[in-house]
Amino acid sequence: MTLRPLALAAALLACTLAFPNMAATAKQPASAPAHAEDGIAWFKGDVDTAFAYAKKHNKPLFLYWGAVWCPPCNQVKSTVFNRQGFIERSRFFVPVHIDGDSPSAQKLGARFKVRGYPTMILFSPDGNEITRLPGEVDSERYLQVLELGMSAGHSVKDTLVLAQSDSSKLTPEDWRLLAYYSWDEDEGQIVAAKALPATLQKLAAACPPGDTGVHLGLSALVAAATAEPANQPATDKAAANALLLRVLNDAKLARDNMDILTNYAGDIAGYASAAGTPERARLTETFNAALEKLADDTSLSKADRIAAVDAKVAIARLDAPQGPLAPALVEEVKQRVALADRETTDLYERQSVINNAGHTLTDAGLLDESDTLLKSELKRSHSPYYYMLSLAANAKKRGDNTAALDWYEQAYGASKGPATRLQWGANYLANLIDLAPADDKRIEKTADSIIGELAGTQNAFYERNRTALEKIGKKMTTWNAGGAHDAVFKRIRQEFQGVCDKLPASDPQKATCAAVM
């Protein structure tokens, strides 16, 4: 799915953490608030049993995994899973909810090739993946895409093969299945990441004219704008500019594609126009007008409306990233954030709304206001440790390394769940090395804590856990370059090796563990 590119490093960590277990699939951690989706009969049992049940009863299987703290997950719970339309449809498939901190989570992540939170996959009754659903679209569009997947004659993978061999054979439904596939969560299953921009560009060019083609065209533009330069296909910038103007000037098209317009405003506007040109001026003016309408659109979720305001900030910073914003825009940010804060009472929804609001304040240069909002939420949130990462990032942005490390430490200390604690700990340790490299004692103490918990974590060397540990290994190796911290480094490495030694020789995790340090 397409998640907005959050400005704070905390959020970048946030939506890409661990994945679920087996036996406790239908259970939330004790710290979670009451279910917003109580009407859904989540399957009680492990994943393999769920697939067997789906096959026996000839039902598709809907697999959702997320985390208690994850803002986009809470957004889905408060805008999709609590909808009567979704609850009614859930009776026609086997719904499986896997919590990200359950013991087999990372191993499942490797099995299903998933990383980001939330990921939602629809499988056929025989266990083949049909599609990955985009969690960033509004609830009505989500239900339409879900219905499309349930009635699809073939998978997105097979549909793509057909599109690449003879696109004339695709039906309008086939094109919609491709257009609304969660390409950001593909993880290279269908298309290698490097090839995605060019692939989407070709699909957009082949798609018949209409709303589906517009969405594919915008998706291709996002992929190109956010790709590494070496992976960017040749793009007709004038055509890209024209596509954006067409969408922005059409209220329905803008509303239908609000996820792209709000999440990637700065990226696509910057890619489709050059700084200081009349084309840039016209595009940004038109963008602002469309975003203003989206921010006022009460049919959108509060989180999406705040995202539209943040997009206005991104547009304003296109040509002057560090410059002051117009006073009117600064005042608008303050007022819209205050309104969203007052009007959002649901705890699930607040986790997403306050996250967006905090980032919007930060992006607007209102660090003190962002801190005030986030600190207030610490008392209210079911997962305050998530917001502590944002507070750390704000302090880091100010250049206050002491305060930043204090918040990273608090976040690690307050975090819950084995996968979450490992990732929060890795983040804290990485920042310690960056911001206080001479503090050997604190670095060793933190590493000892992480390794101590690691020894009791099942499947600790799969997927996101593995990525976090590899990050630690690289950081510490660089930190000790030339033997600058050799005594501490050797003690930490020896302690880590003790974890590796306890793994059975036949366990594939053993080689991964040995390579970390």
Positions of PLM-derived features:
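Conserved redox-active cysteine motifs that mediate thiol-disulfide chemistry
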Residues: 65-80
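Residue at a conserved register position within TPR or TPR-like alpha-solenoid repeats
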Residues: 316, 361, 395, 432-433, ...
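Thiol-based oxidoreductase modules, predominantly thioredoxin-like and allied folds used
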Residues: 40-45, 65-66, 83-105
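Structural motif corresponding to the intra-repeat A-B loop/turn of tetratricopeptide repeats
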Residues: 364, 398, 435-437
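Structural micro-motif
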Residues: 59-61, 106, 110-122
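Generic helix N-cap/helix-start motif at coil->alpha-helix transitions
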Residues: 169-175, 209-220, 253-268, 299-317, ...
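Non-catalytic, surface beta->alpha helical segment in thiol-disulfide oxidoreductase systems
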Residues: 114-156
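Alpha-helical repeat scaffolds
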Residues: 159-163, 190-207, 231-252, 264, ...
